[in-house]
């Protein structure tokens, strides 16, 4: 979205989904004010009555946003902002809008209240089916470093959810899907393939160990689980598929 700067501030909007109640009204939007904090190499965001400070190269915490398809109806979501750069021009990335797990507009868990319970227990967390924004990296909207930071923010949330669930499961089955190794192999397997066409003009050596490091993170989770279970508990670590070089596709 192109924005115009007025001295040290920008007044714009954060756009959400299409208005689900009134056809032809376009996308829902909520006001967003951006203030430049030059001495801190940062910006301040003011949105939905709250302020957030972000430094260059950092993500914001989860930001609660409210959209109004009608004056008396509110649709609540959450998102994170990432400050790519301040100069020579502002570049600010925002994740896709996720359903707010504390006040979900649609069922995102079963039972319905479980999503709310988790948010109260560990704080806000990603609710989008594929939370890691792979297309933002594919299309150059964010770089590899920003994608890695995002992936591990979501990884930390998933780990918290799993370990809390494990603590509260004295018997029966406790299962959790960790997406991080999958997402990172999709995006960084090229670094293990010297002939991959996506490597042209892009950094390779710096990210050659990304996949190995993701499995080290998962090994750490396995260690935490082993420390929490007894000899009568069966632990299964299962992969649903593997990876191989993928150089060409048809749109």
Sequence positions of predicted segments:
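Conserved acidic
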Residues: 147-150, 154, 206-210, 214, ...
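Extended hydrophobic/aromatic segments used for targeting, binding, or gating
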Residues: 187-228
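Metal-dependent active-site segment of extracytoplasmic phospho-/sulfohydrolases and closely related
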Residues: 213-251
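His/Asp/Glu-rich, glycine-adjacent segments
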Residues: 1-201
């Amino acid at each position: 979205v192109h924005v115009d700067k007025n001295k040290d501030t920008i007044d714009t909007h954060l756009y959400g989904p299409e208005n689900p109640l009134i056809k032809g009204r376009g996308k829902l939007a909520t006001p967003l004010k951006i203030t430049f904090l030059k001495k801190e190499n940062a910006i301040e965001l003011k949105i939905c009555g709250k302020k957030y400070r972000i430094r260059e190269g950092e993500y914001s915490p989860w930001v609660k946003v409210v959209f109004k398809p009608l004056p008396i109806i509110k649709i609540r979501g959450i998102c994170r902002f990432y400050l790519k750069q301040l100069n020579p021009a502002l570049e600010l990335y925002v994740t896709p809008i996720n359903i707010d797990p504390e006040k979900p507009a649609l069922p995102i868990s079963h039972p319905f209240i479980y999503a709310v319970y988790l948010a109260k227990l560990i704080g806000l967390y990603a609710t989008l089916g594929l939370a890691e924004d792979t297309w933002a990296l594919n299309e150059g909207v964010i770089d590899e470093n920003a994608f890695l930071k995002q992936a591990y923010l979501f990884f930390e949330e998933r780990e918290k959810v799993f370990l809390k669930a494990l603590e509260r499961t004295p018997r029966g089955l406790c299962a959790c899907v960790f997406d991080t190794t999958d997402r990172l192999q999709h995006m960084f397997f090229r670094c293990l393939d010297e002939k991959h066409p996506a490597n042209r003009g892009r950094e390779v050596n710096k990210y050659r160990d990304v996949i190995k490091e993701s499995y080290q993170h998962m090994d750490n989770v396995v260690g935490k689980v082993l420390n929490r279970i007894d000899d009568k508990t069966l632990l299964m670590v299962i992969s649903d598929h593997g990876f191989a070089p993928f150089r060409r596709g048809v749109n």
